[in-house]
UniProtKB/Swiss-Prot annotation:
Protein's recorded name: Nicotinate-nucleotide--dimethylbenzimidazole phosphoribosyltransferase
Acidic residues bias spans: 351-375
Enzyme class: transferase
Gene designation per UniProt: cobT
Pathway: Nucleoside biosynthesis; alpha-ribazole biosynthesis; alpha-ribazole from 5,6-dimethylbenzimidazole: step 1/2
NCBIfam families: cobT_DBIPRT, PRK00105.1
GO molecular function, one term: nicotinate-nucleotide-dimethylbenzimidazole phosphoribosyltransferase activity
Source species taxonomy: Bacteria, Bacillati, Actinomycetota, Actinomycetes, Kitasatosporales
Length: 375
């Protein structure tokens, strides 16, 4: 039996400050550019002000990319275009600066943190800072067995909470959240199908590295079989993550919830982070107010999850590579929204009150005797 009480998060997590958001909206009304003319950037600036409890909004100066990594046993069925147990190679590419996410992060001057939760490699193959939270080597094959024991699921969840605390304590003011996994999209599809009450075929996508039709059918069958195992434990989110999630997904769920509790905004990347967010919403319904959907990855399960959480993706560029790359592309939009909200000047007071030059002209009294003046 787990000693973790997930219900505590419902009490710990508050919505972003509604009063501050109204103040931000009022300030926006006073600025020289008409309200609404900046599109979603207006909404983003007001959301960020509420998250920060600050008007004018502060710039996003210390963002961080946090990637949770793990291998999934279900990949051995040929449901991924990548070899089973090869996620450590992707992690090395990130650490060496050769992955799309690390290249983008370098360009945007954003540090990247990788957290190994269940990579299928020897722990000494990677730096201690990467592997210190590892729960196990690989996750179980979810179509026929649990991904984790309940104790492992709790340990992974608590690790995610600890990472969120470390980031908040270090002054990180926004997190770009992603995953580095092989087989992770299959587990994510199962979680989303279970929580949304949909069939396997509706949520099964092609994955980050697109698979062919035969692999898609194998993936769909794996999702269907895992879904049967998920339904009996739907009422217990930790049991659900143990049954059909994985150590990386359990950790991401804990990370998302604790980030919301610590009032750290998070940009979600693809279907894996969306699945963890959906589990988090089931635990604490106010938590999604602290998250942004960075992009539409094209995975049908992601669309289902975001719709359920009422999150609209900021970008739609078809980025399927994972590793937080799509969400990273949305970061400059958030930073731009903050800059515009904070730095656009306000209208002069006389113009706001309708007392500008034109108004003064209109209100000037007519001379009493124009003819006398003419003489």
């Amino acid at each position: 039996m787990s000693s973790l009480n997930l219900d505590d998060f419902s009490d710990l997590i508050e919505r972003p400050d509604g009063g501050v958001r109204r103040d931000a909206e009022a300030r926006r009304e006073r600025q020289i550019v008409p309200p609404g003319s900046l599109g979603r950037l207006d909404d983003l600036g007001e959301w960020l002000a509420a998250a920060q409890s600050a008007v004018p909004v502060r710039p996003v100066e210390r963002p961080r990319v946090v990637l949770f990594a793990g291998d999934h046993g279900v990949a051995s069925l040929g449901v991924s275009a990548r070899p089973a147990g090869s996620a450590d190679q992707l992690v090395r590419a990130v650490l060496e600066g050769a992955s799309p996410a690390s290249i983008l992060a370098r360009r945007l001057n954003v540090p990247v943190r990788v957290v190994d939760m269940a990579l299928d490699c020897e722990p000494d193959a990677l730096p201690e800072s990467v592997v210190r939270h590892r729960v196990r080597r690989g996750s179980g094959r979810i179509d026929v067995e649990d991904a984790l024991t309940l104790e492992e699921a709790e340990a992974a969840f608590r690790a995610g909470v600890a990472v969120a605390d470390e980031e908040a304590d270090a002054g990180t003011d926004l997190v770009v959240l992603g995953d580095v996994s092989v087989g992770g999209t299959t587990a994510a599809a199962v979680l989303i199908a279970a929580l949304c009450g949909t069939d396997a075929s509706v949520v099964t996508g092609r994955g980050g590295l697109a698979i062919d039709d035969l692999a898609w059918m194998r993936k769909c069958a794996a999702v269907r079989d895992a879904l049967r195992r998920a339904r009996p434990v739907l009422g217990d989110q930790l049991q659900l993550l143990a049954a059909v999630g994985g150590a990386d997904l359990a950790a991401m769920t804990g990370f998302l919830l604790q980030s919301a509790a610590r009032k750290t905004p998070v940009i979600l990347d693809g279907v894996v982070s969306a699945a963890c967010a959906l589990v988090g919403q089931r635990i604490a319904f106010r938590a999604p107010d602290w998250w942004l959907a960075g992009q539409n990855s094209g995975e049908p399960a992601q669309a289902k999850a975001l719709d359920r959480m009422a999150l609209e993706p900021l970008l739609n560029h078809g980025v399927t590579v994972g590793e937080g790359a799509g969400a990273l592309l949305a970061l400059p939009l958030v930073q731009a929204a903050a800059a515009l909200a904070a730095e656009l000047p306000e209208k002069p007071e006389e113009l706001e009150a309708g007392e500008g030059p034109e108004a003064a002209e209109e209100s000037s009294p007519e001379p009493e005797n124009p003819e006398a003046l003419a003489e």
